[in-house]
Regions:
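Catalytic machinery of carbohydrate-active enzymes
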Residues: 1-327
Length: 327
């Protein structure tokens, strides 16, 4: 018989279960899913956490002390064989597009398979389904991911802000990469592949002049083709971000990365109903969110209505003394 979240099926951890969490879409999606791991381990610290992710997002999880294994999702792979090798007792598929995950988990004999109720094959293969809708609820996406833990009674409440980790050598290299830039350093991402809105080049030129006049040293970290810094991989970019005193970025993967690295962040967001701060703002105490004035506009135009001077009080607030581990 099919079990659904609304049926309030109660499962329990016996201790030492191997849990595989699948999140095979964008960087930001993976980052807002980390509270699922944190919630499990806060109640059951002996659980063993594995992740199934894409190769482009896997570097985010390096050095994370709570992760036992990171496994790559590739095209055409034998997922059933992978699951038999890992031998998890639980598979949680947080993304709704990669429906092969749950069907392969069933073929591999995984006892508990939790997924969103999307796609007939996935619905039939899951043991527990999440039917709750994501849109128009006013809930943050991180809260939506915690819904997948309802069979264990671990859903609800505020999600723990995601955290990313760097090695001492990586932090040192990040400081070396930016040694030529006098502090306070203001790292800038002009746009992101997943950004809901971003200003034009002319807007950024005016904004950087204003930031410089206020004593900041702006440096463009991304996109790579517009940065004057040598090319770097994702871990190197994370280290450079950590070496900055603050980051300004449209809402995209880098914004969530900055918050998870505990770098003070000003996040620029648009007005689309499905991309509001309530749903997608990066999580963390050092995050300031700025939206452009209404009405809604195309992704690259509406943000130009925002006066760059509006950002200055946010940057001043982020300059207030705060503790940043490892810096």
């Amino acid at each position: 018989m099919k079990h659904v979240v609304f049926a309030h099926r109660k499962l329990s951890f016996g201790g030492g279960e191997r849990v595989l969490i699948a999140r095979t879409d964008a960087l930001g999606d993976l980052l807002i899913s980390l509270p699922v791991q944190a919630r499990i381990l806060s109640r059951f610290p002996s659980a063993e956490i594995h992740w199934l992710v894409r190769s482009y997002s896997a570097p985010l999880l390096q050095e994370h002390p709570d992760i036992t294994g990171v496994h790559l999702r590739t095209e055409g792979q034998d997922l059933c064989a992978l699951f038999r090798q890992i031998d998890p007792q639980i598979v949680i598929n947080l993304g709704h597009r990669d429906r092969e995950v749950i069907t392969a988990a069933k073929q591999a004999g995984v006892p508990v398979r939790v997924a969103r109720a999307r796609g007939l094959d996935q619905i039939l293969a899951a043991t527990d389904l999440v039917w709750r809708g994501r849109y128009g609820s006013g809930r943050h996406e991180a809260m939506n991911t915690l819904d997948f833990l309802r069979p264990w009674g671990l859903d609800g409440g505020a999600p723990e802000p995601p955290r990313l980790y760097l090695s001492e050598a990586e932090r040192h290299q990040g400081e070396l990469d930016l040694a030529g830039f006098q502090g306070p350093r203001l790292g800038i991402f002009l746009r992101g592949t997943g950004a809901g809105a971003h200003p034009s080049g002319a807007w950024w030129t005016a904004a950087q002049a204003m930031f410089s006049a206020q004593g900041w040293t702006p440096l463009i970290l991304g996109p790579p083709e517009l940065s004057g810094l040598p090319a770097s991989d994702l871990r190197g970019l994370m280290a450079r971000m950590r070496a900055c005193d603050a980051i300004i970025s449209p809402s995209s993967g880098p914004a969530h990365m900055a918050a998870a690295l505990e770098v003070p962040l000003v996040c620029l967001m648009g007005l689309r109903p499905n991309h509001t701060p309530d749903r997608w703002a990066p999580l963390g105490s050092g995050v300031q969110v700025v939206q452009y004035p209404p009405p809604e506009a195309d992704l690259s135009g509406g943000m130009d209505r925002l006066d760059p001077a509006v950002l200055l009080p946010h940057l001043q607030r982020l300059q207030q003394p705060q503790t940043r581990p490892g810096r």
